[in-house]
Amino acid sequence: MKKVTGQIKLQLPAGKANPAPPVGPALGQHGVNIMEFCKQFNAATQAQAKEALIIPVIITVYQDRSFTFVLKTPPAAILLKKAAGLHTEKKKGSGAHKPGKEKVGQVTRKQVEQIAKTKMQDMTAGTLEAAMRTVEGTALSMGIEIVG
């Protein structure tokens, strides 16, 4: 079995990894072939590239400088912004400046449930209901109102 020398966590745009920061410096420190990672990551995330999603990735680096990586689901905040119509290719909207007082968008309970189902594999929540509450909390802290 190969010995693990490091683990790198990054959040990269789907299908658009390139050797520029943050990818190059993070992988360069561990002696990983940067272009090889970029090619593999872009191929693995090509399907999500059209949606302009940010994909968290955990890269495990081994002693012989080889690597493996695991793709996670996009952050709940990105999925919520997309559902509320705040996140597009050209417009990278942010949440409210004063959450609780200011509302920047709305999502339905059905959309919250869909996001919770998507995120379940990466969450510690035991039930769909618990995952939905977590996503609702994220929405409220961003100033996104939940309707329906």
From Swiss-Prot:
Q: Where is this region: Disordered?
A: 89-108
Gene Ontology BP term (one): translation
The UniProt entry, under Pfam families, shows: Ribosomal_L11, Ribosomal_L11_N
GO molecular function terms attached to this record: large ribosomal subunit rRNA binding; structural constituent of ribosome
SMART domains from the entry? Answer: RL11 (SM00649)
CC terms in the record's Gene Ontology section: cytosolic large ribosomal subunit
Q: Which HAMAP family match?
A: Ribosomal_uL11
Assembly with partners or alone: Part of the ribosomal stalk of the 50S ribosomal subunit. Interacts with L10 and the large rRNA to form the base of the stalk. L10 forms an elongated spine to which L12 dimers bind in a sequential fashion forming a multimeric L10(L12)X complex.
Family membership noted in the UniProt record: Belongs to the universal ribosomal protein uL11 family.
Q: What is this protein called?
A: Large ribosomal subunit protein uL11
- Protein source organism: Anaeromyxobacter dehalogenans (strain 2CP-C)
